[in-house]
A protein has these predicted regions:
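Terminal low-complexity/charged segments
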Residues: 1-179
């Protein structure tokens, strides 16, 4: 049996499974500062903001200055039928407000790096680069993180890459793993 606090005091105490909604004052400030934003909420109440790629860093800087200092994830949705096929998703968290915020921006395959704002973005952006081929401009160390350095071919998690298998030569030895 699990205990799920439901009152706001318990939620503000730090239970990430019971986040608060984006504060009304912050919503109004966002609308004034970024009138072109598209805004919505997920089923669990997480607010998402979609912005044009050129305004992404400005928006991220703005929300970071207002307490969204925890960078938790960078993911991508690949929709090959769209001209701007990649939708980058950045998940941020405010410990002061106890709420999540997802930033979204569409891309053709290139985006500004968030590493100058959030050091934690480093490896997430490298993973997206490696598996989807999205290039993060200004990233200090944009190199492969999961695939072999000599990997050739299309980025493997793109939806237009055919599903199948290719034999990969590797050997597991007792010396390697000490078993």
């Amino acid at each position: 049996m699990s205990f799920e606090p439901t009152d706001s005091a318990a939620a503000k105490a730090g239970n990430p499974s019971n986040p608060q909604r984006l504060p009304t004052a912050l919503q109004a400030d966002l609308a004034a500062a970024f009138p072109q934003l598209e805004r919505g909420e997920t089923r669990d109440g997480t607010t998402w903001l979609r912005v044009a790629m050129p305004q992404l860093i400005d928006l991220a800087t703005w929300v970071k200055a207002r307490g969204f200092v925890r960078f938790l994830d960078c993911t991508v949705v690949d929709e090959p039928s769209r001209a701007d096929r990649f939708e980058l998703n950045y998940l941020l968290y405010s410990m002061a407000e106890h709420c999540w915020l997802r930033l979204k921006a569409r891309s053709l395959g290139e985006a500004p790096s968030m590493t100058s704002l959030f050091a934690a973005a480093d490896w997430y952006e490298r993973e997206v680069f490696d598996l989807f081929g999205v290039c993060f401009v200004g990233h200090p160390n944009l190199r492969r993180i999961l695939l072999p350095d000599d990997f050739e071919g299309p980025a493997p998690l793109r939806r237009d890459v055919p599903i199948g298998s290719e034999p990969v030569d590797f050997t597991v030895t007792r010396e390697l793993y000490g078993t």
